[in-house]
C-alpha cells in the first residue's frame, strides 16, 4: 500500500481521496502520537489550524478541529492564510502543533493536510509514519474539562503582515514603486496587498477575489501570462505571482519578462552577501537549478550546495548547515532568518526592496545570471532503478558531459512516483541542448525498456 503522506503532507481530490472522515482520523491520531512522543509535556496542548480559500477547506477544517478537540487539544482557528503564515504563527503563538489545509498550486478540486510541529517546522518522516499506522485505533477519549476548546483568532492576519513588514527593517522601503501582485485567488489575497502597501508601494492587485472555486485558475505563478501583460499595460516597475498557498513566488520585470526562482536566488544572494548576512557564503539549490546560477554565484565567490529536487531537501541542508538562503527554480525560496519554510510574499518583498535600494530595474538585477538553454525529456515506461547503473546509459552520459565541458551538463533523474527517467541537458545553445537531450533520451529508452 502506498504511503499516505507524500513529500508535502497528505493530498488528494477533496471528498474523494481526502474525506472528512480521513481528516478527522488523521487529526485524532496526530494528537495522540505527538502526545505519546512528548511533544505536549504535561499541559493542555494547543494547535493552530489554517486553510487556503478552497471550498473544500471549510468542511476539512471542521473535521480537523473536531478531531483535535475530541483528543483534548485546544484549537486556534486562524482562517484563510498562506502556508508560510501558518508555520510562522505556530512559532509566534507557541502552539504545540499546526495544521495547514491546502493543495498549494494544484487545481481547485484537490486539497491537502500538512502538519507542523512546535516551532513551525514540518513533522519528521517517522512521526508521519506513526500517525498513518495508528489511524483508527480505539484511543482513550478525554471527557469533561479535558476536552479541547475551539476558538477563532482574527488577529492572526495582522500578526503575520506585521512580521513581513518588519523583516525589511525600515519603513516605506518600497515608496515610489508600482508593483502588480497576482495572488492566484489564493491565500495571500489580503496579506500580500497589505504588506506591500504598508511598505509604501502602489499596488495593483489581480486575481485577488477568491470565491472558493477559482484558486489557481489560469492565474498565479503557474500561469503568469496575465501578470506579464498587466505589468506592461500599467507601466509597473515589476510584478509578482504567488501560488494558491503563497509558498512560492515568480517575478516579472518592467518589460514583462519572467524572473524565475534561480534568478531570484541569485539577486537575493548578492543582497545578503553585501549585508554580511549570507551564512557561510553559501546558497542551497537543487540539481535541477540552472547551471547559470552556479556560474553566476561562482563569479562572486558564493558556493552553491546542490540537493535532490524538492524544497524539503533544500530546507534539510539549510537546517543542517545553518545556511540562510536556498530554493528552487519554481520559486520556492527560503530565507531562514525570517521563515521556516518557503514564503512567496516574504521573498517578493525582499526582491522589491533590492530593486528600490539599488535604483536598478529588476531586469538589470536579473542580468547577474545568464540562464543556459535547457532541454528536458521525460522518458516513460523504463526501469528507473537501472538509470544509474546501466553501462550504455552511463557511457552516453559521460560522452555528453565530455562534449559539453564546462559549458553545460547532463542530469538524469528517476521519478519518485512513476516509471519515468527525466533527462535534462544544459548547453551553450538551445539547438545543442535539444540534440544531446534527444540522443540521450533515445539511449535511455532503448537500454532501460521494461
Curated annotation (Swiss-Prot):
Cofactor info, note text: Binds 1 Mg(2+) ion per subunit.
EC number(s) stated in the UniProt entry for this protein: 5.4.2.10
Keyword Membrane: no
One family name in Pfam for this protein: PGM_PMM_I
GO cellular component, one term: cytosol
Record: active site: 104
Gene Ontology MF terms: magnesium ion binding; phosphoglucosamine mutase activity; phosphomannomutase activity
Membrane-crossing residue ranges in chain numbering: none
Cofactor(s) this protein requires: Mg(2+)
Binding site for Mg(2+): 104, 243, 245, 247
Keywords on record: Isomerase, Magnesium, Metal-binding, Phosphoprotein
Reactions accelerated catalytically: alpha-D-glucosamine 1-phosphate = D-glucosamine 6-phosphate
PTM (free text): Activated by phosphorylation.
Phosphoserine, modified sites: 104
GO biological process, one term: peptidoglycan biosynthetic process
Family listed: Belongs to the phosphohexose mutase family.
HAMAP family: GlmM_B (MF_01554_B)
Classification via PANTHER family: PHOSPHOGLUCOMUTASE (ALPHA-D-GLUCOSE-1,6-BISPHOSPHATE-DEPENDENT) (PTHR42946:SF1), PHOSPHOHEXOSE MUTASE (PTHR42946)
Record function comment: Catalyzes the conversion of glucosamine-6-phosphate to glucosamine-1-phosphate.
Official protein name in the record: Phosphoglucosamine mutase
Species per Swiss-Prot/TrEMBL record: Cutibacterium acnes (strain DSM 16379 / KPA171202) (Propionibacterium acnes)
Amino acid at each position: 500500500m502506498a504511503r499516505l503522506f507524500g513529500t508535502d503532507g497528505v493530498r488528494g481530490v477533496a471528498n474523494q481521496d481526502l474525506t472528512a472522515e480521513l481528516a478527522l482520523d488523521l487529526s485524532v491520531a496526530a494528537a495522540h502520537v505527538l502526545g505519546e512522543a512528548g511533544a505536549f509535556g504535561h499541559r493542555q496542548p494547543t494547535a493552530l489550524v489554517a486553510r487556503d480559500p478552497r471550498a473544500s477547506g471549510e468542511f476539512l477544517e471542521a473535521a480537523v478541529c473536531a478531531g483535535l478537540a475530541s483528543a483534548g487539544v485546544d484549537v486556534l482557528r486562524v482562517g484563510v492564510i498562506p502556508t508560510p503564515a501558518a508555520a510562522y504563527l505556530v512559532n509566534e503563538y507557541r502552539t504545540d502543533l499546526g495544521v495547514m489545509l491546502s493543495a498549494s498550486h494544484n487545481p481547485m478540486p484537490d486539497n491537502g493536510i500538512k502538519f507542523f510541529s512546535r516551532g513551525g517546522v514540518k513533522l519528521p518522516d517517522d512521526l508521519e509514519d506513526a500517525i498513518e499506522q495508528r489511524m483508527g485505533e480505539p484511543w482513550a477519549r478525554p471527557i469533561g474539562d479535558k476536552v479541547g476548546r475551539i476558538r477563532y483568532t482574527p488577529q492572526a492576519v495582522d500578526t503575520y503582515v506585521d512580521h513581513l513588514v518588519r523583516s525589511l527593517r525600515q519603513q516605506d522601503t518600497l515608496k515610489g514603486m508600482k508593483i502588480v501582485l497576482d495572488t492566484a485567488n489564493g491565500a495571500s489575497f489580503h496579506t500580500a496587498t497589505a504588506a506591500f502597501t504598508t511598505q509604501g508601494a502602489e499596488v495593483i492587485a489581480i486575481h485577488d477575489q477568491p470565491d472558493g472555486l477559482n484558486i489557481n485558475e489560469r492565474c498565479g505563478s503557474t500561469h503568469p501570462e496575465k501578470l506579464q501583460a498587466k505589468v506592461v499595460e500599467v507601466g509597473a516597475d515589476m510584478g509578482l505571482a504567488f501560488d494558491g498557498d503563497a509558498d512560492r513566488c515568480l517575478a516579472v520585470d518592467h518589460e514583462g519578462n519572467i524572473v524565475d526562482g534561480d534568478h531570484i536566488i541569485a539577486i537575493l544572494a548578492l543582497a545578503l552577501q553585501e549585508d554580511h548576512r549570507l551564512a557561510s557564503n553559501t546558497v542551497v539549490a537543487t540539481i535541477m537549478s540552472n547551471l547559470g546560477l552556479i556560474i553566476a554565484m561562482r563569479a562572486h565567490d558564493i558556493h552553491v550546495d546542490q540537493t535532490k529536487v524538492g524544497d524539503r531537501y533544500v530546507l534539510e541542508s539549510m537546517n543542517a548547515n545553518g545556511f540562510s538562503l536556498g530554493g528552487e527554480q519554481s520559486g520556492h525560496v527560503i530565507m531562514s532568518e525570517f521563515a521556516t519554510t518557503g514564503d512567496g510574499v516574504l521573498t517578493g518583498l525582499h526582491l522589491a526592496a533590492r530593486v528600490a535600494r539599488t535604483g536598478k530595474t529588476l531586469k538589470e538585477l536579473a542580468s547577474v545570471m545568464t540562464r543556459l538553454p535547457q532541454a528536458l525529456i521525460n522518458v516513460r515506461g523504463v526501469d528507473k532503478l537501472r538509470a544509474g547503473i546501466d553501462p550504455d546509459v552511463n557511457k552516453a552520459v559521460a560522452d555528453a558531459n565530455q562534449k559539453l565541458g564546462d559549458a553545460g551538463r547532463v542530469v538524469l533523474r528517476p521519478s519518485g512516483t512513476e516509471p519515468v527517467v527525466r533527462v535534462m541537458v544544459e548547453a551553450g545553445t538551445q539547438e545543442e541542448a535539444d540534440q544531446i537531450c534527444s540522443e540521450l533520451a533515445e539511449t535511455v529508452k532503448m537500454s532501460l525498456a521494461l
